Amino acid sequence: MRLFGGKNNKFKVDPPKIRIEKVVVDRPAQKPKPKPNPALSGSASRSSSSHHPSPKPLARQASHSPYPSSCDEKRLERKRKAPSVSRKSPASDRIEFDKDSDGEDDGWMTLDTKRQRKGTEDSGFVDPNRKLRSVRAFEERMDSRKFIHAVDVASLEHKCVPVMGAQKDEVAIRLQYPSLQPREKYELVWGKDKIDAVEASIKVVRHVAETYLTEEEAEPFTNPNGGIIRRLEKASNRNIQDLMGFKAALREYNEKLRALVDDGVIAKNLDKMHELPQHLVAFILDQIYDRTVALKVELLSKYENGTDYVYGELLHPFISKVLVEQTRMTSGQVFVDLGSGVGNVVLQAALEIGCESWGCEMMENACNLAEEQKKEFDARCMLWGVRPGKVHLERGDFRKNAPIHEALKRADVVLVNNKAFTSQLNDDLVRMFLDLKSGCKVVSLKSFVAEKSNNHNINDVGSTILEVEECIYPEGYVSWTNAGGSYFISTRK
């Protein structure tokens, strides 16, 4: 293409003047964990916010399963072991390139539920045009075979063992979600690298009470003295192990929630909401990952260093920081992920922002897993009663993909995890950015603008069409290292 080189190059510019603004992202210090106090373990504190119909989240409890559990710290640690190493827990099965301590993303799950995607305190930003409720989820029931039940991946058939002293014919339970959809099947069992049914069911109950109900409606669930959550935690305590008590509390939860759904309470509350708490977004995405990618994560190890086929993930907190706080995306906008892997970021943008979300990937195994995730994503959103943005997943080379090129013309935010891209591919991307509309943001791990003038004409084009800002991400934001690093937000001039 003579446009970018040779005598006919029409881009004649002065040496690029690059504005670099370093933005330090402060990571909230973790609060020290209080010493266990059985009398207070179920207590709840209420938020003073008034825009949501939901109470402030309860303090998180550790799993009381008598066996080692896939605790939050391991579930949220995205610096995953390579497939050749034994896996920690379902949601922990991410590709890892070094060994670091657990729990680096723990603060991600302890964010205040009532905080407007963190923007309430920082910027007051809310997207009033987002319609969060899925009408279909409250009008029709999907076939229970449309989604992957927990029992399909963690059961007696999968060599798991019963917990709480249950006999084999006592392990089956079902869990109601905040919609008309079928209840999910679980078994009260434990197995290495398997879904912990005790922990998972308590978390679902807690998320429903915190997000979908007003304080008054949530009282039967959150009351520290005999509320359903308190009873579930007490019954599953390793020193008590009350199987019948646990199942009775879960049955009561199912009945009360279904009554609230049938009475239109859940739908009414969702209609007043315009966003989901970040920790619920992460929980739903992890449910999807656990039932799809985690089962076949070894397929992602087939990459080659020094090529454009290296696999790595940007984690939930990173994406929330960029899409919610920095670029302030809204549900009416368009997001494009170039090199979308298994689709994690595409799905997060659609769920957390509600925007039209595009992704393109050329690695076959990653594409196949992305399709599996999308199918489960659609079903899980129905279970939770929420309507995400439209998701489009494309296969192949994004440089040659016509739908992606059309989407780029409308894009408001483009993400390129180009940390391991070859220089040729990065150069080709700059050419593609000529079609971006003015004001479009390009988020990347490497800058597309050279720091110093050189003879590489493509960098002259980058400085001509992009204004770049350098930012710093803290530790625990990417899958391939625990260390922090730089990323760039470029704006199309």
UniProtKB/Swiss-Prot annotation:
Biased composition (Basic and acidic residues): 11-29, 90-100, 112-121
Entry GO terms, CC: chromosome, telomeric region; nucleosome; nucleus
UniProt KW keywords: Chromatin regulator, Methyltransferase, Nucleus, Repeat, S-adenosyl-L-methionine, Transcription, Transcription regulation, Transferase
Cystine pairs: none
Taxonomic superkingdom: Eukaryota
Keyword set includes Ribonucleoprotein: no
GO biological process terms on file: DNA damage checkpoint signaling; DNA repair; methylation; subtelomeric heterochromatin formation
Residue stretches of biased makeup (Low complexity): 38-52
Binding site for S-adenosyl-L-methionine: 311-314, 335-344, 361, 397-398
Renumbered residue ranges of the record's region Disordered: 1-127
Enzyme Commission numbers on file: 2.1.1.360
One Pfam family from the record: DOT1
Main location: nucleus
Gene3D superfamilies, A to Z: 1.10.260.170, Vaccinia Virus protein VP39
Reactions it catalyzes: L-lysyl(79)-[histone H3] + 3 S-adenosyl-L-methionine = N(6),N(6),N(6)-trimethyl-L-lysyl(79)-[histone H3] + 3 S-adenosyl-L-homocysteine + 3 H(+)
Protein's cellular compartments: Nucleus
Keyword S-adenosyl-L-methionine: yes
Family indicated by similarity: Belongs to the class I-like SAM-binding methyltransferase superfamily. DOT1 family.
Function text: Histone methyltransferase that specifically trimethylates histone H3 to form H3K79me3. This methylation is required for telomere silencing and for the pachytene checkpoint during the meiotic cell cycle by allowing the recruitment of RAD9 to double strand breaks. Nucleosomes are preferred as substrate compared to free histone.
Other comments on record: In contrast to other lysine histone methyltransferases, it does not contain a SET domain, suggesting the existence of another mechanism for methylation of lysine residues of histones.
Protein name from the UniProt record: Histone-lysine N-methyltransferase, H3 lysine-79 specific
Organism: Gibberella zeae (strain ATCC MYA-4620 / CBS 123657 / FGSC 9075 / NRRL 31084 / PH-1) (Wheat head blight fungus)
